[in-house]
């Protein structure tokens, strides 16, 4: 009875726009109504799949529906704009990827929001390790051999990406900047044509998320050389990280995480983070993510926000280095 009255009071305050109620009180009964989960990508992609898996668990554990609202377009910036303008009350949250920080540098002043100032990070959901992959016709089996071959054939090896400024483009740009190799970028419009070109031998190398190439690797149609993350991939346990395989310090692993509008009360952020982390260790969630060749990546709020700032700077430097931009 007492909890019901408290929930009604919180909803009344929210309806009146009164945000001065004690944050701890609001968080105690949060969520008191349906939560909108904006996923700024079409249904069926990694962000959507991961978001739905975890948000279903939050619906079950918190007793309110976390309803997905797919708002695709402009590499996630359309949906992000919706969240940036939403009330900071915990009832609009966003599932987005590393693309969020890249967009800040690709779109620049074209964005209607500030990537760091207008959002608060809640926590990471999963890591999407990228893997340096080559067509089997390229006579290399290790990152060191790839680098040596590229140096012996400056400008002759080409690599595909899913577009200018995309994660695969920037992952290779980092490798180029760290090793001094000279290889040619061939951008495609999306991950599917990027991988198709590599399979056909139109391009000879590429970075791709493990999930997009795992079946081709298992069938022998593509050859993995090294992971862009600092941790091994459960889907490719025999593939070393680039740091282990001769490129010390290489670390660029895309992720998927949860955000809220800036100004959302910290107790609500902390509560969401705790529930997300509980969900990420559930055996069925871990298994569902592994089926997508993704690794669960629980984090604290501070760890996630630190990663955001590090990747914001890293992506900014790489985008400036490549000259990539959205016209």
Positions of the model-derived regions?
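Short secondary-structure boundary segments
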Residues: 97-98, 136, 210-211, 229-230, ...
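Hinge/capping helix and adjacent helix->loop/strand transition within the periplasmic-binding protein
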Residues: 85-91, 105-193, 242, 255-288
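N-terminal (or domain-start) structured segment
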Residues: 27-118, 156-158, 164, 180-205, ...
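Sec/Tat signal peptide C-region and signal peptidase I cleavage site
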Residues: 4-5, 21-27
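An extracytoplasmic/periplasmic, membrane-proximal ligand-sensing/linker region
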Residues: 2, 32-34, 177-179, 241-244, ...
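Bacterial N-terminal signal peptides
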Residues: 12-21
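Short beta-strand->loop
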Residues: 114-124, 160, 182-187, 204, ...
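Bacterial N-terminal signal peptides that target proteins for export
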Residues: 3-13
């Amino acid at each position: 009875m007492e909890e019901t009255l408290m929930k009604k009071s919180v909803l009344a305050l929210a309806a009146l726009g009164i945000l001065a109620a004690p944050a701890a009180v609001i968080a105690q009964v949060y969520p008191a109504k349906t939560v909108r989960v904006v996923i700024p990508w079409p249904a069926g992609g990694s962000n959507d799949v991961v978001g739905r898996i975890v948000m279903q668990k939050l619906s079950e554990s918190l007793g309110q529906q976390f309803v997905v609202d797919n708002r695709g377009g402009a590499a996630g910036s359309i949906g992000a704009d919706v969240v940036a303008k939403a009330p900071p009350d915990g009832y609009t949250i966003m599932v987005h990827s590393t693309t969020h920080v890249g967009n800040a540098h690709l779109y620049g002043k074209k964005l209607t929001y500030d990537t760091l100032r207008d959002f608060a990070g809640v926590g990471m959901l999963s890591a999407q390790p990228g893997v340096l992959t080559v067509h089997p016709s390229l006579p290399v089996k290790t990152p060191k051999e790839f680098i040596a071959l590229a140096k012996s054939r400056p400008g002759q090896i080409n690599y595909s990406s899913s577009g200018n400024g995309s994660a695969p483009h920037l992952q290779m740009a980092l490798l180029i900047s760290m090793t001094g190799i000279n290889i040619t970028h061939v951008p495609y419009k999306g991950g599917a044509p990027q991988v198709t070109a590599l399979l056909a031998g139109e391009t000879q190398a590429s970075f791709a998320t493990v999930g997009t190439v795992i079946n081709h690797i298992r069938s022998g149609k593509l050859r993995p050389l090294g992971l862009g993350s600092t941790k091994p991939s459960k889907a490719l346990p025999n593939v070393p990280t680039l740091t282990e395989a001769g490129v010390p310090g290489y670390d660029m692993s895309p992720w998927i995480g949860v955000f809220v509008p800036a100004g959302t009360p910290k107790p609500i952020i902390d509560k969401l983070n705790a529930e997300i982390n509980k969900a990420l260790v559930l055996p069925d969630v871990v298994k569902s993510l592994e089926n997508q060749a993704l690794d669960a990546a629980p984090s604290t709020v501070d760890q996630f926000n630190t990663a955001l700032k590090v990747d914001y700077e890293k992506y900014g430097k790489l985008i400036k280095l490549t000259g990539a931009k959205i016209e």
